């Protein structure tokens, strides 16, 4: 998966790589459901780097394979999904929607 983001913030990269809204990722980070390099992510503003591993407690995982800069100064981030498929990510999103009610 290749995403283009204005920053390398954890919430932006996770959102782009997992196909979830940035606000959803922020809520998940606040609830302790997002891990960065196997440790609970403490801030949405954490900068993601090469070889970082972003994972959700449900098993979905992203590995940062490459970070380069575009000609316009944005970041081209190559991610690899592992440990889960998109259905688990969608299930997490659906269960979060129910929790918000």
For the regions a language model picked out, list residue spans one by one:
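Strongly charged
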Residues: 1-15, 40-101
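C-terminal accessory/binding modules appended to enzymatic or scaffolding proteins
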Residues: 2-31, 35
């Amino acid at each position: 998966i290749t995403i283009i983001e204005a920053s390398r913030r954890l919430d932006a990269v996770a959102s782009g790589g997992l196909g979830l809204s940035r606000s959803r990722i922020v809520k998940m980070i606040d609830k302790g459901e997002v891990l960065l390099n196997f440790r609970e992510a403490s801030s949405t503003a954490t900068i993601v780097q090469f070889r970082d591993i972003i994972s959700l407690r449900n098993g979905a995982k992203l590995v940062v394979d490459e970070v380069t800069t575009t000609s316009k100064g944005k970041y081209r981030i190559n991610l690899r999904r592992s440990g889960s498929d998109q259905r688990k990510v969608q299930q997490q999103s659906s269960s979060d929607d129910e929790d918000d009610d």
